[in-house]
Amino acid sequence: MSGYLITIGLETHVQLKTRTKMFCGCSLAFGTESNTNVCPVCLGYPGALPVMNREAVKLTVMSGLMLGCEINRVSTFDRKNYFYPDMSKDYQISQQAKPLCLGGGVTIQMPEGQKRIRINHIHLEEDAAKINHSARFSGVDFNRCGTPLMEIVSEPGLSSPEEAMAYLQSLKQILVYAGVSDCNLEEGNMRSDVNISVRPEGQEALGTKVEIKNMNTFKGIYAALEYEIARQLGAVSHGGVIVQETRRWEAELGETQPMRTKENAHDYRYFPEPDLVPIVLSAEQVEAWRALLPELPSMRRVRMMAEYGIPEYDAGVLADAKENADFFEAAARLCGQGQGKTVSNWFMTEIMRLLSETGKTITQCALTPEALAELVALVNGRAINGPTAKELLPELFNNGGMPGVLVHARGLGQVSDAGTLEAFVEQAIRENPKSVEDYKAGKKAAAGFLVGQVMKLSHGKAAPQQVGKLVTEKLAERV
């Protein structure tokens, strides 16, 4: 609706990829029986003391570095006090006064160009337990309680559901690239609280904020934003007043519904966590962690275009998943200069088809970059033809091995002997007189049919280019 500005901010909670919980040694294995991965610390027993997970600190700092944040070399934990069944000790250990990471941002690509979405801060905390509701009762599963959770708080700089999606997808890609989280939405690894407000154009102050809690699917976030923006615009355009409140998304109804009103910011009565010492990081430690960072996906796309001569679309598809880009680059380097597009074609057609059919990732299949590079070399050297290579690829994908060994063992080498090929061509012409007559009548497609017959006679081993040339020459003699 013209005349109004939309403002969106996101608070994204990301479960970090650690083996154990934030303040105890309990396992984080997903899918285990309820309330089995627990101990006195994560259950909040009196007198149980937390011990900080160093790996969680490292992964949070690495995330901040990937996102261009300033790292707070002295960081502290605080107690966020609230009473709710999902936090048995009645407070959450979080960071409020001195979070680990400050500033930074995510660059998104929109149809109108690039836009930088600024981040306010990233803090580290423990996750709450999971409340499971049934028809007659609710239960609390404390397996999740204490999971290392990184909260990435954006500035209110998003102005549409499309921008919110671009931000979340870019953020997810960067974090997965860095190896700090799986960002598996189905397992709850990535969840967002969404803040939306509307205000008249020209008004500096933001409108009244409405928060939608704990959204765990991109599709749901997009739909909730669309609905809530329309609801708020409809209200203010008819003289209504937006109430500051927390709402939930009801996917089955396709609408947001009130949970609780918030006349003022909720008072969590933060105070410094007395059982944990501050995190003190040296410059050397921060730089050591910086050295572990991968290349940003956006930078990798640009570099691969320049280094391997592949188009922007190919680079975007390949760089979308780090393991795919790693595989492509390894194979392209083995193939040598000028073969980037060839390797890209193989990966984006045949290999991605096999990945889709099997539901595997490239790291889960048996195909290696060395095998793909050798397959490309065999085709380029005319030791085998394209159809034979495509027949070999599924076996290499499923069972591994090297294509040269398979070609030798099965006698699949390409037939390029002129005399042998000429005999095949003569046989095809002799057995298909109608095609010869069609060619004489000007139907050039008849030559292609005869080439196919030669390939069939040679069991796919004939060199296609030589066959095409021979067929054309033999037909010309008969015109």
Predicted regions, residues:
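Core structural elements
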Residues: 188-200, 268, 305-329, 340-357, ...
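Strongly charged, low-complexity linkers/loops
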Residues: 362-373, 386-456
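Amphipathic alpha-helical core segments of compact helical bundles
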Residues: 17, 199, 230, 348-356, ...
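Basic, nucleic-acid-interacting segments
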Residues: 1-295, 306, 312, 334-338, ...
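Short, amphipathic C-terminal "tail helix"
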Residues: 444-479
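Extended, non-catalytic structural segments that build the interaction scaffolds
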Residues: 285-292, 299, 330-337, 372-384
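Structural motif
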Residues: 309, 333-343, 381-384, 441-445
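Extended hydrophobic-aromatic, low-complexity segments
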Residues: 279-280, 315, 327-330, 339-342, ...
